[in-house]
Amino acid sequence: MFGRVVSGLVLVVGLVVAPPALADSGPPTAKFPPGFLWGVSTSGFQSEGHFPDSNWTRYADRKAPGVTDPYGDSVDFLHRYPSDLKLAKGLGVNVFRTSVEWARVEPRRGHRDPKALAYYDDLVRRIKANGMRPMLTLDHWVYPGWVADQGAWDNPRTRDDWLRNARYVVDRYKGQGVIWITFNEASAYIYKELTTRPMDLGQMLKMRDALIKTHRAAYDMIHKVDPGALVSSNVAYGTALNGIFDAAMFNDVTDKLDFIGIDYYYGANLQNLTAVHSLTGEFWKIDPEPEGLYYVLKNYQRRLPHLPVYVVESGMPTDDGKPRPDGYTRTDHLRDHIYWIQRAMADGVKMMGYNYWSLTDNYEWGSYRPRFGLYTVDALTDPTLARRPTDAVPAYRSIIAHRGVPSGYVPVRAPGWCSIEDPVATCLGTTPT
């Protein structure tokens, strides 16, 4: 998942960041190119259910800060993945992102669970059989209970243990066209650990250094074991994080990325400061800022012009599946963001792919209330865990089939004035249209 709370905490910092101005490109005319990667994202822990001992099962069991709902069996992807993959195939996507969970693969040090391996083997096989490319995350914020017992990232041994497990997983799935993500949103990973277990500044810095060193080692290992594979680590949110977290982490791994992975959910401008709701976990109260994605993409492309850009996660939460009070639908949100990606492409951004978060609703780090799924699931009240399509299912299918929104599309949500993503251009210049 994503660093939504982290983003909210540093919105003010973003006002001092000045990424490139919005060019007057007009409505998009170019379609997404053939071979563009359209996908859906999820993570193992958040969707699988029936989860072994881990840091996050412990956080859920003890109701750590931010945890309001029991984990239960989540949406039972562990047993329903064959039918869920059919739903993904029906969208027309060609990428399916999930995570190979260390806690499931190695529930005890040195012991690999054959049932877990059989599950992941079949999952990867079925992803490919359904015409999709696997995007596999090696660490989506979850580690085994025995790693927690040894001090997690406070203990230097964890880095070696992590790399040993990663080598095993990469060895197992090499040569299958996997796109590898080492760490999901490393800076948000640190923040989430900080908010769920006691950590002091020294521990935070130790974890930061460990994640940087581990990613760098993993990048080299993956290219040795799986030559030609694409490897990255996705960055949470975008330019509002640059002032703090990019300086602390992203800048230390830019030479070990094959593409720029971006997760974008919301921005802010002087007409829209609703991102403060991220501090309370009420993400559905945030008014989306689709045009902010344009600035984020342009900014990262400017910084790393030799790399293509992939939106690894993007989506919109609703309050337990209820319609937004302002009438802005999941379809509106999806189309508006695709529009701004096409604007960015028209202005030179080398887009590689786009993943929607998520295929189904899932466990959002302590709560089932935020609903992000293209297919909604009542995890707490429906024992059948039925997948019910939202309005965005046919919309995404049409976008993929027609390679974008049509020429002349006008965003439902108009750009705001004085965006945090580009304060110089948007506060002093003309509001984009």
Regions found by a protein language model. Name each.
Residues 1-23:
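Secretory targeting and sorting signals
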Residues 20, 41-43, 99-103:
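Acidic/polar N-terminal loop/beta-strand segments that form early-domain functional surfaces
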Residues 25-61, 118-325, 332-432:
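Active-site region of glycoside hydrolase catalytic domains
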Residues 63-71, 101-104, 197, 276-280:
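Short glycine/proline-rich turn/loop motifs
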Residues 66-80, 156:
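Active-site mouth loops of central-metabolism enzymes
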Residues 72-73, 111-112, 207, 285, ...:
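A generic structural signal for short
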Residues 76-101, 133, 303:
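Catalytic domains of carbohydrate-active enzymes, especially glycoside hydrolases
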Residues 91-118, 136-139:
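Aromatic-lined carbohydrate-binding/catalytic grooves of carbohydrate-active enzymes
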